[in-house]
Amino acid sequence: MLLAFQAGEGQRRIGAEAEWFRGLLAFPYTNRLDELPLAPPYARARYPFSFTYNGRPSDTLLPVWPTASGSNDLGGGVATSWRAWTDPATGLRVRFESRCHQGFPDRDWVLYFENTGSRDTPVIENIQALDLTLATPLEGDASYRLHRTKGAPADPTDFEPAIVPLKAGQTERLSAGGGRSSNRDFPFFKVETGEGSLIIAVGWSGQWAAALNSPDRHHLRVTAGQEQTHFILHPGERVRSPRILLFLHRGDTWEANARFRQLIYRYYAAKRNGRTPLPILFCNTCFTRGGGWLNECNASNQISLIQAYAPLGLEALITDAGWFEGGWPAGAGNWTPRHDAYPLGMAPVAAAAAAHAMIYGLWFEPERVVAGTEFHRLHPDWVLTDGRPGQTTLLANFGLREVQEHFFTIVKGFMALPGFRFYRQDFNMDPLDYWRHNDAPDRQGITEMRYIEGLYAYWDRLAATWPDGLREECASGGRRIDLETLQRMPLHQKSDYWFDNEVDQASLWSLSQYLPNSLVTAPLTRLDDYSFRSTLAASLIPAWIADAPGFDLERARKLLDRYRAVRHLLVGAWYPLLPYSRSARDWMAVQFHRPDLGEGMILLFRHAESPYRTVEVALRGLKAERNYALSFDNSGETQRVRGADLMSHFLLSLDARPGSELITYREIAERHHQ
């Protein structure tokens, strides 16, 4: 399932990229700035991170602190290394833990700060988990080029991409919004440099921030970390930074994205039973009635849908919000089933799913607590406020182990039900003001750190206890997708903006830049080809009222059979054949390619007002000298075309407006005659 590289050129490229990372981590490094004319002092960087301690920059402290280091091969293609610096005067220990992955030009790391002394440390502040100065500009007016992607505000612009030339004197800033990591900006971005395309991912499910500053035509300084840090550490206390992942590809910039997706799928995407799953088919019943079917759900109608979906071979069915006492939204904090809707609890529904070879699950929102609910009444000391009087929305403090244990026990009770193995977590509030309100002046950032660390511990425990389970992350849609959530949740709802075909095409185009499509989910409520293909590039959520009289079961079966036949292609390389667009006058086209299998797929869309009947595209990643067998779903036609022709000019036509096509291709094995 991995992108395979040819020997020769590919190996030389990987070697050159690996050399770049070796230079980066040869502490202290200079990134060859001295070789450039007029290299300004402010562009120098000694380490790929920075912080200020007791008013002094880390670049001046670390070179004189005692150090220790080590490395380890974890097996499975993962190698780790670490280096630690300790201040002999105060006992502050800074530990840099890094890892890389066989066959990929990458390096990720986390910083840890620990007080090994007997007194509080001086103030540690302005921690930049990434502080990197590049000195290899592109040619032309723009010395560097940034590919940035918007977050998910739950509107048509969700994950909208932009390419920004970084000119001298310009600073571009990216950040989370309100404490949810992909609320404002997506924490994956790419910089085109003269040395190659550098993809940067930030793993922090809270308030991260990044800045890219080009002080002159030669240099680009990139920083990223938790947005606000200014704190002392008590004796024995230890905290961590966001995780930083760097990925460098020399060559075509879109090939960088194709390779990066493979890295994520193999080494970062959350596992199920020790394996990275293919895209998953499941039903969230709330989407069968427009996404708002919540408090109306009950045991009877949920079992009815389970029985109706059974012939379609879904892997799971879940009930969304509203199943608990108090209902949606005011019942968040009551985690017992509503007696009027589920008089025997959730056991009969889970048992019905198990009887039809599905697993069952529920929506939870453990972090948001409505004032007056059971959680608040029993544990008022476990919640955070933002300081406003009359607070009705509270935040469960996941920095407390008691809170983590409490919710684990709740989930454990449901997981004990036969057939129950799906956990969906939502988060419908911005936590940032709650975190910061609870920080002392000399502890700014600590509440957020403890909260995020606790959340990760809770998620890790869920995964370790039920390795056969499925877990889905939602935060008012796709507002908390980052490198750390990907490692813990196999599924992520991409948006709370639903059922718009052109928007689905566009947002999936954007997410495909960095993520294998198994990781994101999209609901499908219609049975036509155009809608099906618009949402196909995801873990698909069929959201039909399958128990309605007259439901076209055979049509639904045909669509899902087609999905199962091609979903393995969604975890391979991805290439944009046409630019991102939501315009009614444009076309959209993308390619999914599995070089290890010699096959792939093209999704093609003509929007409703496009005046053009034909479009020309050029495929990528094929073998120029080989022939490929193409199959067109609309007509059933097959063609035999040379790879060189497909990669230079491939004309495609659609008469319908809107219209779509799904084309699969497979490399033809050549017969050798003796």
Functional labels for PLM-detected ranges:
Residues F231-R250, P658-R666:
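Short Pro-Gly-centered flexible turn/kink motifs
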Residues A16, L455-T638, S653-D655, S660-I663:
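Active-site-proximal substrate-binding groove within the catalytic cores of carbohydrate-active enzymes
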Residues T288-R377, E405-H406, R450-Y458:
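Aromatic- and glycine-enriched glycan-recognition loops and surfaces
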Residues V641-Q674:
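C-terminal beta-strand-rich structural cap/linker in extracellular carbohydrate-active enzymes
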Residues P329-D340, R368-R388, N438, D442, ...:
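Aromatic- and acidic-residue-enriched segments that line the glycan-binding/catalytic groove
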Residues L281-N284, L317-T319, Y360-F364, Y423-Q425, ...:
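Hydrophobic faces of well-ordered beta-strands that scaffold small-molecule active sites
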Residues L2-N213, E227, N627-R640:
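Polysaccharide-binding surfaces and accessory modules of carbohydrate-active proteins
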Residues L278-F282, G290-N298, H339, E365-G413, ...:
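Active-site-adjacent "subsite" loops/lids of carbohydrate-active enzymes
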